From Swiss-Prot:
Assembly mode: Homotetramer. Forms an RuvA(8)-RuvB(12)-Holliday junction (HJ) complex. HJ DNA is sandwiched between 2 RuvA tetramers; dsDNA enters through RuvA and exits via RuvB. An RuvB hexamer assembles on each DNA strand where it exits the tetramer. Each RuvB hexamer is contacted by two RuvA subunits (via domain III) on 2 adjacent RuvB subunits; this complex drives branch migration. In the full resolvosome a probable DNA-RuvA(4)-RuvB(12)-RuvC(2) complex forms which resolves the HJ.
Protein name: Holliday junction branch migration complex subunit RuvA
Span list, region Domain III: 147-196
InterPro entries: DNA_helicase_Holl-junc_RuvA_I, Hlx-hairpin-Hlx_DNA-bd_motif, NA-bd_OB-fold, RuvA, RuvA_2-like, RuvA_C, RuvA_C_sf
Similarity comment: family membership: Belongs to the RuvA family.
Function: The RuvA-RuvB-RuvC complex processes Holliday junction (HJ) DNA during genetic recombination and DNA repair, while the RuvA-RuvB complex plays an important role in the rescue of blocked DNA replication forks via replication fork reversal (RFR). RuvA specifically binds to HJ cruciform DNA, conferring on it an open structure. The RuvB hexamer acts as an ATP-dependent pump, pulling dsDNA into and through the RuvAB complex. HJ branch migration allows RuvC to scan DNA until it finds its consensus sequence, where it cleaves and resolves the cruciform DNA.
GO cellular component: cytoplasm; Holliday junction helicase complex; Holliday junction resolvase complex
Keyword DNA damage part of the UniProt annotation: yes
Pfam families (alphabetical): HHH_5, RuvA_C, RuvA_N
Amino acid sequence: MYDYIKGTLVKITAKHIVIETNGLGYIVTVANPYSFSDQMNQTIQVYLHQVIRDDAHLLFGFHTEDEKEVFLKLISVSGIGPTTALAIVAVDDNQGLVAAIDNSDIKYLMKFPKIGKKTAQQMVLDLAGKFAELPAETTNTTANQTAGNQQLDEAMEALLALGYKSTELKKVKAFFEDTNETAEQYIKSALKMLMK
């Protein structure tokens, strides 16, 4: 098991980042890869969780230990795998998640990709009262301003990778067409819209 990795950020894609350390490039799947845009070619530290399967060894990365803790609690719920947990972590609204779990708000929980009624109920059963020590937000990085349409396309790719449907994303993309923000800002805003 690994706690964290420290190395140079050398690549960002819609699904993951690549961190080079000691001559090896580690693929680390993260909730919002573009939140690392301002740290390209710099030394970064990312908290890790390793998943070992028969066909792959996967690394999931997080900005903070609190974000990792949310992820670990989510994957402890039957029916929630790492990809679904990342999609939930990506919303970056712990207060909404905690309130929904503590208040048994099944409808809110079902707005996350791949979360049906049964899984939402299981989340409430397994996690109610277990998030008391977590802060309101898990990440606090910002990205540099760049070309809007390319950034919007990258944000939509990342949301597709998290499991959102292209039909949902077309409506969201149309809303942002005339704006100029970073991919990270688009993702955060889009996730808030999708959760309404």
